[in-house]
Amino acid sequence: MKVKAVAKQVPVTPRKXRLVVDLIRGKKIKEAESILMFTPRSASPILAKLLKSAVANSVHNFNFNIDDLYVEEIFVNEGIRLPRLFPRAKG
């Protein structure tokens, strides 16, 4: 059974986040947590929080054992771009 956790509106570029996501895909939960703890990227704390949420969902909702869990699928997509104002002459 798959357990799902979603993070939306994350202020990290998808390109930077994919570098970290590729490191933990297919790893056991404990190994993925240690990788995220020692990876000096801006997306690491956000992904660590997301991983912790997914583990909490699996333990609380489905009574899974933490030692049996691993990251089967994880991906990063581009979100909504905020409109920016470029101050310049418009006429």
From Swiss-Prot:
<comment type="similarity">
    <text>Belongs to the universal ribosomal protein uL22 family.</text>
</comment>
<keyword id="KW-0689">Ribosomal protein</keyword>
<dbReference type="InterPro" id="IPR001063">
    <property type="entry name" value="Ribosomal_uL22"/>
</dbReference>
<comment type="subunit">
    <text>Part of the 50S ribosomal subunit.</text>
</comment>
<comment type="function">
    <text>The globular domain of the protein is located near the polypeptide exit tunnel on the outside of the subunit, while an extended beta-hairpin is found that lines the wall of the exit tunnel in the center of the 70S ribosome.</text>
</comment>
<protein>
    <recommendedName>
        <fullName>Large ribosomal subunit protein uL22</fullName>
    </recommendedName>
</protein>
<dbReference type="InterPro" id="IPR047867">
    <property type="entry name" value="Ribosomal_uL22_bac/org-type"/>
</dbReference>
<dbReference type="InterPro" id="IPR005727">
    <property type="entry name" value="Ribosomal_uL22_bac/chlpt-type"/>
</dbReference>
<dbReference type="GO" id="GO:0022625">
    <property type="term" value="C:cytosolic large ribosomal subunit"/>
</dbReference>
<dbReference type="InterPro" id="IPR036394">
    <property type="entry name" value="Ribosomal_uL22_sf"/>
</dbReference>
<comment type="function">
    <text>This protein binds specifically to 23S rRNA; its binding is stimulated by other ribosomal proteins, e.g. L4, L17, and L20. It is important during the early stages of 50S assembly. It makes multiple contacts with different domains of the 23S rRNA in the assembled 50S subunit and ribosome.</text>
</comment>
<dbReference type="GO" id="GO:0003735">
    <property type="term" value="F:structural constituent of ribosome"/>
</dbReference>
<dbReference type="GO" id="GO:0006412">
    <property type="term" value="P:translation"/>
</dbReference>
<dbReference type="GO" id="GO:0019843">
    <property type="term" value="F:rRNA binding"/>
</dbReference>
<keyword id="KW-0687">Ribonucleoprotein</keyword>
<keyword id="KW-0694">RNA-binding</keyword>
<keyword id="KW-0699">rRNA-binding</keyword>
<dbReference type="Pfam" id="PF00237">
    <property type="entry name" value="Ribosomal_L22"/>
</dbReference>
